[in-house]
């Protein structure tokens, strides 16, 4: 009986950590490839979201958004700011500091947001 319990415990230790790591990895990728279409990408490293807003909508609270070398883009014709209401880290995928270009009326941080190795740029003079 003891041997059976020990074997079950060893199997649980060996098999469970990969499952836990897969569930807890909440990283979403974005890289602007052109156009205003969000139809490209699914948020993985191999197929990042084209638009930053899609990555922001997909990332869970406490997660990370990785920005590719080509940067990220937020485009809008309205006069509302970009609102980030999640606890999220926004970081570069590599050692470069890609630019996150924002064409909105500013940025409102409603959550605990950390920017690491990225350049945040407000690029449209038409917004107040």
Which role fits each region the language model picked out?
Residues 63-64, 88:
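Surface-exposed loop/turn positions
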Residues 8-18:
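Bacterial N-terminal signal peptides
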Residues 79-80, 85:
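Predominantly extracellular beta-rich ligand-binding scaffolds that present long acidic/polar faces
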Residues 85-128:
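Right-handed parallel beta-helix/beta-spiral solenoid domain characteristic of secreted/periplasmic
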Residues 33-40, 62-63, 69-74, 94-97, ...:
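Acidic glycine-/aspartate-rich tracts in secreted/extracellular proteins
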Residues 1-5:
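Positively charged n-region of N-terminal signal peptides that target proteins for export
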Residues 19-54, 71-72:
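Right-handed parallel beta-helix/beta-solenoid
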